[in-house]
Amino acid sequence: MSFLCVRTVSRFRSLSRALAPGFLLLHGNAVPKTAVFFRQQSSNTRLFSSYTAPSGVEENNSKSALKNKLPPGKEVSSKDAKEKITTSAIDLALNSVVKVFTVSSKPRLFQPWQITMQSESTGSGFVISGKKILTNAHVVANQTSVKVRKHGSTTKYKAKVQAVGHECDLAILEIDNDKFWEGMNPLELGDIPSMQDTVYVVGYPKGGDTISVSKGVVSRVGPIKYSHSGTELLAIQIDAAINNGNSGGPVIMGNKVAGVAFESLCYSDSIGYIIPTPVIRHFLNAIEESGEDVSFGSINLTYQKMDNDQLRKDFKMSDKMTGILINKINPLSDVHKVLKKDDIILAIDGVPIGNDSSVHFRKKERITFKHLVSMKKPCETALLKVLREGKEYEFNSSLKSVPPLVPKRQYDKSASYYIFGGLVFLPLTKPYIDSSCVSESALGKMPKKAGEQVVIISQILEDDINTGYSIFEDFQVKKVNGVQVHNLKHLYKLVEECCTETVRMDLEKDKVITLDYKSAKKVTSKILKSLKIPSAVSEDLQPKQQNKRSKVPPKSKEH
């Protein structure tokens, strides 16, 4: 069995020890505490790198110590030529990199009407043009407070999260204080480094409170699944130590930023990952163009490779043709309008796709074609060259991402829930699957309608009215009074607007629950009161209250 350890190794300091949620494994008696969670699934094992703690790898708080790490005149290769790392470049980094202090809290997974204890964590960030600070989304996810401290200062400045891109694990902070910006210099984005290029990771990792720098070499460039979002995007692997707390800090090559530090490989020494500049620019451009809507392109289909000779022959591919075979297409996607099952995608925007699903990247490097797809904006189209029953066709189609049936991750939002007769209904999410006995089969399914959700009975708050129903925890609700359930809001509406004495719910595996409507409503009120639950329904499901204030008509002019 392969293992995936997703560790949020942010250092969490409990602000209320007695309220520690069950999913936190608290080690030792002294605060601060470290929150760690594990799950089994895949061989891709990585960890986040936000932290707050003393460490043995800190650098001296002086510029001279950093200069020892980054000697002037040190030669490193760039994309086209070699550049010299000068003292001015080091000084620029010192006057740009900041430490980010975050207090966060999120809804409990199984009691969504409650929030977890507040926790403190830290990460890094750096100044970019426009008086903005770039950091990781996971550094400020579910934040209730964000503060920033610059190098050489003891003052923490209040920061505002201006924009977040959870897909790409990036965020922008703003600080409305002129004193903070005194002496601060923005860093400039560079190009993707080449293999064996030397880079320097600057930030505030574990082990101390001062700025630190570590040196590494680029060992690999290619898409990976970002741990924060589960989205597959381009990343750069380096052998520099990206420790807890480095998240959000710049990785410098020459006098420019090569990427943002954000992950490292569990149980491996000096294998770190950085977000490259094409992903950063895509994020920044999206913020500039649409405010807060940050999304990356998606192929919205499943496919298989065409390595087998007989398979290529049966699908009428010539010896010169290469591509991938379409297995299933998301019915809500734009490509569903032009592509068909068993089509062979030969090329995207004129770039041939190999039988192994790779495309040419640079020199002799190849990466998955998904990188070309991910860099598409929602408003852009791609030219798809397709082989269908032996004939070649070309189609223009948008590659706008379609929300999955089961969300991978959810941040910065209140949880949805509905309680009726002691039954707690929730929309199924991947974190819920990872923390329960629910089958992962729903993860591979595609939505048939926009807004569709898998609604489950998360738990049953015991009462005489639901006796015998506890065995149906984690079961999906298929129908309410014979009507197919579209999502949680639809279920809420079907139950609340019930006109019959009995509410019937058809579950998966052909199981059935029935409740007397009036009795269930009374029991719900009793349960809410006894368990101190503020409401039977989350705010997002409640109908918006219309403004009942009567408008005062304008006074008529006297003639």
UniProtKB/Swiss-Prot annotation:
Any GO molecular function: serine-type endopeptidase activity
EC number: 3.4.21.-
Region Serine protease: start-end pairs: 100-292
Keywords, in A-Z order: Hydrolase, Mitochondrion, Protease, Serine protease, Transit peptide
Annotated organelle transit peptide span: 1-48
One example of a Gene Ontology biological process annotation: proteolysis
Catalytic site: H138 (charge relay system), D169 (charge relay system), S247 (charge relay system)
Basic residues bias: start-end ranges: 546-559
Pfam (any one): PDZ_3
EC class name: hydrolase
UniProt keyword Transit peptide present: yes
Compartments where found: Mitochondrion matrix
Major place of residence: mitochondrion
Residue ranges, annotated region (Disordered): 59-81, 538-559
S-S bridge residues: none
Gene3D superfamilies (alphabetical): 2.30.42.10, 3.20.190.20, Trypsin-like serine proteases
Cellular component aspect of the GO annotation: mitochondrial matrix
Domain PDZ: 300-380
InterPro entries associated with the record: DEGP_PDZ (IPR041517), DEGP_PDZ_sf (IPR046449), PDZ_sf (IPR036034), Peptidase_S1_PA (IPR009003), Peptidase_S1_PA_chymotrypsin (IPR043504), Peptidase_S1C (IPR001940)
Function: Putative serine protease.
Family the entry assigns: Belongs to the peptidase S1C family.
PANTHER family: PROTEASE DO-LIKE 3, MITOCHONDRIAL-RELATED (PTHR45980:SF10), PTHR45980
Designated name of the protein: Putative protease Do-like 3, mitochondrial
